[in-house]
Amino acid sequence: MPKKGTYVSKIEATDMNTLIYIRKAVEMSILDLLAGHLTDNQKDKLNAILDEQKEIISMDTSISKSRLFYENDNKFHETLFEFASQSKAWEIVSKNATALNRVRVMANLRESSRVEEIYEYHSKMVLNLISGNAEEAKKLFADHLDGGFDGLNTVIEKYSDYFL
């Protein structure tokens, strides 16, 4: 007899690794394009996003903080894609990142200290993009992305029912 209800599809771990690889390759290329070439308007927009992140960090409610920061983190990276005229690439990456986003929330954004760490990475990335230091911006991004998924195995163990 069929049952009604909500079914949460399981996450394919190998798909996540592929998405991480693609995202990293594309965004590294974008950082190369942008370093030293941001307009004053673009700098202002990135700094405004950083100000929003700082404001979110100061919030008391951790659930709201996590959700808002997650949305703002996506806004930060989407803006970088937009500045490099790669909005379509962001659309493709984000459309295919549902499982990846679920794991990001489970792995990182529940911890207040992790949110602050992400903000620090973003701030340093922007400073290096403005100064034209693509290599340091890319190193920071790689550390930021890799650090975001360091807890992946822990998440898989802790929430094994959600993974294939």
Predicted feature locations:
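Short linear motifs at protein or domain termini
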Residues: M1-H37, N41, K45, E82, ...
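Conserved amphipathic alpha-helical segments that form helical-bundle/coiled-coil interaction surfaces
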Residues: T14, G36, D40-A107, I118-L127, ...
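Active-site loop of classical SDR/Rossmann-like NAD(P)-dependent oxidoreductases
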Residues: R114-E116
